[in-house]
Amino acid sequence: MIELHSPQYLKVTFALAFGSFLVFCNLYLFQPMLPYLANHFAVSETQINWLFAASTLALSLCLVPWAVTSEAVGRRLVMLTGLFAMPVIGLAMLYAEQFWFLVLTRALMGVALAAFASVAVAYMVEELSPQAFGKAIGGYIAANSLGGITGRIAGGLLTDALGWQHAVVAMAIFTLLGALLVAYLLPVQQHFKPQRGLFFHHNRALVKHLQNRTLWLAMLIGGVNFALFVNLYSVMGFRLVAEPYSLPIGIASLIFVCYLAGTLSSKLTANWNRRFSAIPGMMLGALISMAGMLIALIEAIPA
């Protein structure tokens, strides 16, 4: 097993964190572009949101199939397949003359993103010692949020300065270089044992989990809160570029810096759970979120 602070540990944790960073950069790249692309393709706000929804939906649907595939062919191969597919799919978006084709390529991007997201933690569990894993998972989660912020801000600034196609090309080049770095740093697994014929086993386990009412409640709470959280940013993007603010997309995308508040609060969660419990924490989080949404209704703050 790879121990904490060893040279191998640093390589593995950086490679997986950077891979996760690339995944979330690509997932959220299009969110600040939505107002611009709605005008470009002459579609409604509801229709343009499919650019974001298609990739997220495809990602969620493909997590289990990719995880099952990795049981047979290995975690590393699945992760690298996803990473190297991402820039190829990104460049294919440049051929989108019709809106439906861009939605389709974004859905394919979600499939590629799921390849990495579904098995990175499994790789860590199998290769890292328990102490090393405990430290590594924190950096991995932090990379998720930093990737989301970077993708959103880069998408807005590059679209504002150069156009959406150049933003996509820049992200594709960055992702390709990053994928090469991850492939170089991430070692072949030493503790992986291939297992085949697990597709139906995992499906039965998934159905069993879905029959658990407590899990349904937990998933409902998490799903609703995440949907409100993500879509509020989309709504604010449309609001900030419209009257009376009329901000450029690049400036409007800076609202995603607020995402860092979640990065900070997630670090405090462990301390909260040690002193209190999860349920009061969820209630407090919901109240703070509700307060934020009510504040967002205010048109302007008087000087």
Model-based region annotation:
Residues 2-5, 187-218:
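Juxtamembrane intracellular "pre-TM" segments in multi-pass secondary transporters
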Residues 42, 74, 95-101, 129, ...:
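Helix-breaking motifs and short loop linkers at transmembrane-helix boundaries and internal kinks
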Residues 61-97:
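Conserved MFS/SLC helix-loop-helix module at the cytosolic interface between two early adjacent transmembrane helices
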Residues 63-74, 264-277:
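Helix-to-loop junctions at the C-terminal end of transmembrane segments
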Residues 78-91, 280-294:
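Structural signature of the two symmetry-related core transmembrane helices
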Residues 89, 100-108, 303:
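Paired small-residue
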Residues 105-144:
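Cytoplasmic helix-loop-helix junction between adjacent transmembrane helices
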Residues 139-186:
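Helix-loop-helix hairpin linking two adjacent transmembrane segments in secondary transporters
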